[in-house]
């Protein structure tokens, strides 16, 4: 899977301005007064400005890493507001096929993770990258798709330890009841979310498939099976 994300410089300015306002003066109204104060240059041929025919994908992964980088850069100039890195991802899971009645099914689910520790306190556990997202109840999934949810819990001590620990990640286990195909589009498989001011890194993500015959396979972060 590709990891390129074509990002417009003006959009990057908007991200940066929203970050400034939320970080330094969250009581004021959002406005465009910061636009003329910021100069953004994204070099051609980079992961944020790929050149055709480079494939585009992973928008959510790159967006979250940009937020981490902005937080780290701005935090160096304002140490009292410095945050660690979070799970910085929007894990996508897909399961599709035909059920026993020959009806097509297709599940598309977005996963949650640990939000970074911050000066105000510990990071929240099992949270979406997007503030307004909520989880789909397990009972709904089991009623409408040929699967069972066997695990749905936070991963104890998976957030980076420190004065204000990082939020714990989420463990989600599926039992598939019908043959089908699964796709995973995730990140944080190789790199740990970093800590700051002496705080330690958090845990990476992993994916394990256990087949009906008992064989086990550790899967990469982006794959189809």
Features from the language model and the residues they span:
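Glycine/proline-enriched, intrinsically flexible loops and inter-domain linkers
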Residues: 1-225
């Amino acid at each position: 899977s590709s990891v390129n994300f074509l990002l417009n410089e003006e959009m990057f300015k908007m991200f940066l301005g929203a970050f400034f306002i939320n970080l330094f003066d969250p009581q004021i109204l959002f406005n465009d007064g910061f636009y003329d104060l910021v100069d953004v240059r994204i070099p051609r041929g980079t992961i944020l400005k790929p050149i055709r025919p480079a494939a585009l994908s992973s928008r959510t992964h790159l967006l979250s890493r940009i937020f981490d980088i902005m937080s780290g850069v701005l935090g160096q100039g304002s140490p009292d507001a410095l945050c660690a890195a979070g799970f910085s991802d929007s894990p996508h899971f897909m399961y599709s096929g035909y059920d026993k009645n020959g009806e097509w099914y297709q599940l598309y689910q977005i996963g949650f993770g640990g939000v970074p520790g911050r000066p105000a306190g510990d990071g929240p556990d099992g949270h979406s990258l997007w503030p307004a997202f909520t989880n789909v109840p397990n009972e709904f999934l089991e009623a409408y798709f040929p699967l069972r949810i066997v695990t749905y819990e936070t991963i104890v001590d998976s957030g980076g330890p420190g004065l204000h620990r990082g939020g714990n990640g989420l463990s989600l286990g599926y039992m598939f009841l019908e043959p089908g195909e699964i796709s995973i589009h995730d990140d944080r498989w190789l790199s740990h979310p970093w800590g700051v001011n002496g705080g330690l890194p958090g845990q990476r993500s992993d994916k394990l498939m256990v087949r009906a015959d008992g064989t086990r396979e550790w899967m990469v972060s982006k794959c189809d099976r």
